[in-house]
Amino acid sequence: MALLAPYLLADGRLPVGAHTYSAGLEPAVAAGLTRAQIPALLRARLHTTVVTEAAATALALRAALRAPVDFAPVQEALAARTPTAPLREASAALGRGVHRLARRLDPDHPAVTALARIRPRPLRPVTLGALGAVLGVGEEELVHGVVYDELQTIASAALKLLPGDPLDSVAWIVAAEADAARTVTEALAVRTPAELPARTPPLTEQWALEHDRRERRLFLA
Amino acid sequence: MPDNASAQQPGQPAQGPNEHYHQPLNQPRALRIGVAGPVGTGKSSILATLCRELAGELSMAVVTNDIYTDEDARFLRSAGVLPTERIRAVETGACPHTAIRDDVSANLDAVEDLEEAYGPLDLVLIESGGDNLTATFSPALADAQLFSIDVAGGGDVARKGGPGITGADLLVINKTDLAPHVEVDVTAMVADAERARDGLPVLALSKHDPESIARLADWVRAVLVRHRSGTHVPTDPGPMAPHSHSHDGS
Ligand SMILES: Nc1nc2c(ncn2[C@@H]2O[C@H](COP(=O)(O)OP(=O)(O)O)[C@@H](O)[C@H]2O)c(=O)[nH]1
Ligand SMILES: [Mg+2]
């Protein structure tokens, strides 16, 4: 089991472009979300989009460890459950950074070469599955990373969008522990791409569409 | 990608699930020049000037980084110096410094997309969205960079240094036409800058002075020649001023 890899994956400083992403916070703020509502947003996402993303990541890791590697079923299942084009595009843009890192670490790994065959570009959970295989991370650790990253992304973006005490951000994450644990359990229970839950809250979709048309934004999505 | 048909090997299908853009083997990828410097010192204007001067002879594209994503891109598109689709803005998550140094992913994506859509390109200009003297480009993104300061910032700026001023491939002292109005002696400012830069070039520029614009364009052409011949080595001015230059104080 890899010692450092899970920490690398969870580190916001990992240079894969994630600092350009607010995990839906900027679109939500534009629609009127207040600072006091951020903990509720974290919980809402943990029970919806994050279950889908984390489950897809675990499926992708399993696919990455099989021979031959075939990401198409999970990529297609996830794309079908991400109906809003700007969200698919954001996921693909973030996936591109992860793909670039995986290529740098192990260009000939079968999971990395399989990523290059996917068109349109692989979504982030698919690339994370490949990176997890490259780094030798287990599926539980990988899913922990996805869930934690979502919380940290929103909490960090809040410092730019709804500024306040940075220590609050930490407290929000700690308070989300129980919900995060449920998300992990649910995500790991998904065994096949066909079972991937479609958790697409209508407001998340609508806000993402509005954000895509907005000028002067700070974050990709 | 009809533009890239010439890059295909004979017999290889033009379309396919694994189609990637490949630069022709005999030609290096586009030269990427970063334009950094404090807000308002004329970076976007320099990009517009370079497009105006060079777009006739070179295939060019532009990437902007801004705190608010698309201000600079909109300015450049409205300047009409390049087809609008060749000007891309990247989101920086309110961290424009990170986007050109610690994590250049979004910028690399934009450059690669432009090469894929319009390649082969000769030159990609990348504008930084930084707001101070310390933001410089990582060599992972820019092959060469120019740093812009202006006379309106005061004659002392060049002497105070900072990584861009001391280490950028070219230092531009901009808006020299304003010097008489802000009581700055351009010659002295250039001399100060040259002392701070250990022989690296300094260019006094004004968008109203065609001769200075010609020198700027010539500098880009010269870097491009070196880039193509493989003799240009990207150097990193670093995120901090070298200690050996910090004795001036402030
Ligand atoms: N007088 C004068 N003004 C200039 C010159 N170059 C740029 N400016 C003006 O300086 C201001 C800021 O320029 P801009 O290119 O947007 O700077 P940026 O923030 O560094 O991109 C604008 O009002 C420009 O018109 C110059 O050579 N002379
Ligand atoms: Mg500008």
Swiss-Prot record, chain B:
GO biological process: urea catabolic process
Pfam family, one: cobW
InterPro entries: CobW/HypB/UreG_nucleotide-bd, P-loop_NTPase, UreG
Record bears the keyword Transmembrane helix: no
GO cellular component: cytoplasm
Ranges of compositional bias, category Low complexity: 7-17
Keyword Membrane on entry: no
Residue positions binding GTP: G37, P38, V39, G40, T41, G42, K43, S44
Compartment(s): Cytoplasm
GO molecular function, a single term: GTP binding
SUPFAM superfamilies membership: P-loop containing nucleoside triphosphate hydrolases
Key words, A-Z: Chaperone, Cytoplasm, GTP-binding, Nickel insertion, Nucleotide-binding
Residue ranges of the region described as Disordered: 1-24, 230-250
Record text on subunit structure and interactions: Homodimer. UreD, UreF and UreG form a complex that acts as a GTP-hydrolysis-dependent molecular chaperone, activating the urease apoprotein by helping to assemble the nickel containing metallocenter of UreC. The UreE protein probably delivers the nickel.
Function of the molecule: Facilitates the functional incorporation of the urease nickel metallocenter. This process requires GTP hydrolysis, probably effectuated by UreG.
HAMAP family listed in its UniProt record: UreG (MF_01389)
Protein family: Belongs to the SIMIBI class G3E GTPase family. UreG subfamily.
Name used for this protein in its record: Urease accessory protein UreG 3
Species per Swiss-Prot/TrEMBL record: Streptomyces griseus subsp. griseus (strain JCM 4626 / CBS 651.72 / NBRC 13350 / KCC S-0626 / ISP 5235)
